[in-house]
Regions:
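Short, exposed beta-strand "edge-strand" segments with a Pro/Gly-rich flavor and a Y/T-containing core
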Residues: 8-11, 38-41, 157
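Conserved acidic
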Residues: 8, 12, 57, 64
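Short strand->helix junction
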Residues: 9-10, 36, 86, 118
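Conserved strand-to-helix beginnings and helix N-cap segments that scaffold or border functional pockets
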Residues: 14-17, 40, 92, 122
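C-terminal accessory/binding modules appended to enzymatic or scaffolding proteins
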Residues: 1-15
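A broadly conserved detector of short glycine/acidic/proline-rich loop/turn motifs that flank catalytic sites
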Residues: 7, 34, 132
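Conserved catalytic cores of soluble enzyme domains
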Residues: 58-61, 66, 70-167
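A structural preference for short, pocket-lining loop segments at secondary-structure junctions
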Residues: 2-3, 17-56, 63-82, 104-108
Length: 167
């Protein structure tokens, strides 16, 4: 199966998540060759709920996003992401759940939610920490990984190439 996001800025919404969940019944490739692999979760959509004080709907949406990311991570079939361009926030979180990432060299990746006062919620924080825990520096000092990831996420830092994104 192949999934390609097609919303404005390839922002994630319920339809995107449904497509991802349903596609994991077979090996899956998540790809997008536009300027954005995915600019993350559709914040305009969630702000509409906030404007109506409908926080239950925001909670439901976030939970569904978390379930979708977990579904990708623990799929019985291989999941491959092939991102290019902007891969931010929720788009990053979808990408890091994959078994394999074949990234274009023209990429900007990161968890940028803190820049707008939000906390990443799709499992990207734990995936980033897991990768940093495997570095030689973290094996010598386990606090190294935690501090490095806290710095990256806390400041909404991005990497501008696949090699820069590696721990």
């Amino acid at each position: 199966n192949i999934v390609e996001f097609t919303t404005k800025a390839n922002a994630l919404n319920y339809d995107s998540m449904d497509a991802l969940k349903k596609a994991t019944d077979k090996p899956l490739i998540i790809i997008n060759e536009s300027m954005q692999f995915s600019a993350g979760v559709n914040l305009t959509y969630t702000m509409e709920f906030a404007d109506k004080n409908d926080f239950k709907s925001i909670e439901k949406f976030i939970k569904y996003f978390q379930e979708t990311c977990k579904h990708l991570k623990y799929s019985k079939h291989p999941v491959i992401s092939a991102p290019s361009g902007l891969t931010l926030g929720g788009g990053f979180e979808v990408m890091v759940q994959s078994n394999f990432v074949a990234s274009h060299t023209n990429i900007v990746v990161g968890l940028v939610e803190t820049i707008v006062g939000l906390i990443p919620a799709g499992g990207g924080c734990k995936e980033m920490l897991a990768r940093w825990l495997n570095t030689d520096e973290a094996k010598a000092d386990p606090n190294y990984a935690s501090l490095k990831v806290f710095d990256i996420i806390g400041y909404g830092k991005t990497a501008t190439s696949p090699t820069e994104a590696e721990p």
